[in-house]
């Protein structure tokens, strides 16, 4: 209450920031009179002037008003588009490394040109991150005209692009690309054998488009580069045949072999299920007689069985994946796009392939991985823009340290968001949806229908076809046409059905997309300039008539066929209507059979329907119901936030280790004078460690095992050092002197190798051996960390803190890996006999991984730990240092719900 009162008196922080930016906007507007009279050449020369001022010590903030005014003028001349004042505010928000929430259709793409130009002046590079190649290419070509007009270079990074082109794109002042490609290029740069093969520069400044989709929705799935591992794919087929013979439990207490927990996406075998599974596996010869699934030799069978159960019980065709060209292709659950080349990990993808009876590919070995959270936090400055960020402002602040600023709209929003209608069954719901679509079509109002899956998309399409209602279908199977379909979705009588609208990146303009049609006329070589001008004029007039007609009909009507588990995704769908003050409307149709309601709220809403004696086909429409659904969404959002936070806490451990390894790699690649000193230090450390095993520090001669030391030096490093003879010849030879003499002998032996082949070749060979050893041990270490992480949540049952145990054991594994690398390098270099330079090149060849695959892995350990915590099995928590002010129980919840903390996220504490 007090905070609301203070906000009413002094305004919110967001209001204060907008006022602060508005003062700078006035300065920029005043500069327009100075900049407008400049010729094109004079305007272009401003770029050189700004660069000179930066080199003289002037800060970017000091240049901002003038630079923004220059970009605005260039945009007017090149694109015929002038930045609104609210876009100038958004540009300042991005420049300061914050997130700008700007409603759909308000011009985020144009807004971004302001901070992009300003920050590109430093010469360190600016990365613009989009959700797909189409948008990266489109924006680079479209907005690139402004930058090129002002004398800056523009590059675009696309998947499957030649290496030289990619290096050139990253070398440009401004680079467009997808989040996946930036992340994979970073990982690939840390797998190269020569520094010249790297493509990326220093990570300076990134602006992330659809920042909520990339930094939140995809934060649970790390980027992974993997290679094929050895293994028998036939086992998946043999296990798949058995899965239908196992029965699913209807509930916890009913008979059956396994249960499915949809909330945690887990499949668990019951005791009877284990016995039945053992019997079935024995029948097909996979489990030897008199042995158990619990035997160490049969652990892989449990892995195969669990993957098969998950494939059958949790993953559905045309919802989670599609089958194309004898392959299982994953469907992105957030955007509805196909993700060819991506594969689920832990054998799940192979299990789905066996289920669908397509060719089974071998399992993968992880070569390198990173989460988007840790990749984007490496940028010196990070900013983002989206139409829906405010509901996730707390997470952006907690995880990335990014403040969210809501940018005022250029015109007031005129869209009418109607209350949800809830039906008992999906059949009744779809009947109501068809009736609403039919009503809109008959009066000419355009409709956009958002569905949650390809399956529902095609079901609705079939129903509309039966009703003889013409419509367009947009889903992951036709993403090549998606921009054209969406661009024309605002025309009269247009009915468009689309899967999840996140990241589509194309505005829906009432009356159809005028600019798209005009651009086609402009690039038509068959027309002369006069004809083009006339045709463009006619097109504008015809569009204006269509535009006014659609506005009279009420604008674009949005229909949601189900609520997503995130309110933000629902808001993205709604936000497609009512752009720049246009009229519009939206409504969600729900049923008690929808996943969200079935899992979280069906009993409560069903009781309301029963009390009201609702007849079949009648919908319930009440603020209480809408509030109950939003509460269910908040529960899921809070749970997903906890999962992402836990995943980050685990990945931070691996990230610290990754930084050390990658830094060592880069130092090796960049060492111009060779790495002889490093190799010498490693050799001394390894030999001293070996000596210590046989001649302990500060020990007397009677405790020494000299024969053992001589044997170890000979077998490990092929060194024949007469230690016993030295001791017999010199009675004054003590431990320290002996160590020095052994090391001197070792170094002399190694120096002989160097002289034999030449210092240059030996330096090259040392570098290759070090890189190969680091890479191979790092791959093994990643697998060990993965294995450790999968079972670490079970430590909670032993009254241990899983996170603390993971950190401790991961550190021990890492220390062991570093020792193994040193020993490996020393042994190879001491024992190898180099006869030609070709041998050096062969090492470089073998150290380069082949047949790489790029994908997101389905990490589930954070969810498993979360489950064990909620079931009351968490160990006693360790003390921690709070990084921010404690939130009072009666304070407003930081998630933005408007409720007290104790009644919202505080319930989770």
Swiss-Prot record:
Its cofactor is Zn(2+). The keyword Membrane applies. SUPFAM superfamilies: Helical scaffold and wing domains of SecA, P-loop containing nucleoside triphosphate hydrolases, Pre-protein crosslinking domain of SecA. It is found in: Cell inner membrane; Cytoplasm. CDD domains: DEXDc_SecA (cd17928), SF2_C_secA (cd18803). It is an enzyme of class 7 (translocase). Residues 865-889 have a biased composition (Basic and acidic residues). Keywords: ATP-binding, Cell inner membrane, Cell membrane, Cytoplasm, Membrane, Metal-binding, Nucleotide-binding, Protein transport, Translocase, Translocation, Transport, Zinc. Residues 567-586, 859-909 are annotated as: Disordered. ATP binds at residues 87, 105-109, 507. SMART domains: SecA_DEAD, SecA_PP_bind. GO terms for molecular function: ATP binding; metal ion binding; protein-exporting ATPase activity. It catalyses: ATP + H2O + cellular proteinSide 1 = ADP + phosphate + cellular proteinSide 2. Its EC number is 7.4.2.8. GO terms for biological process: intracellular protein transmembrane transport; protein import; protein targeting; protein transport by the Sec complex. The keyword DNA repair does not apply. Zn(2+) binds at residues 893, 895, 904-905. It is a peripheral membrane protein. NCBIfam families: PRK12904.1, secA. Monomer and homodimer. Part of the essential Sec protein translocation apparatus which comprises SecA, SecYEG and auxiliary proteins SecDF-YajC and YidC. Belongs to the SecA family. Part of the Sec protein translocase complex. Interacts with the SecYEG preprotein conducting channel. Has a central role in coupling the hydrolysis of ATP to the transfer of proteins into and across the cell membrane, serving both as a receptor for the preprotein-SecB complex and as an ATP-driven molecular motor driving the stepwise translocation of polypeptide chains across the membrane. This is Protein translocase subunit SecA. The lineage of its organism: Bacteria, Pseudomonadati, Pseudomonadota, Betaproteobacteria, Nitrosomonadales. The gene is secA.
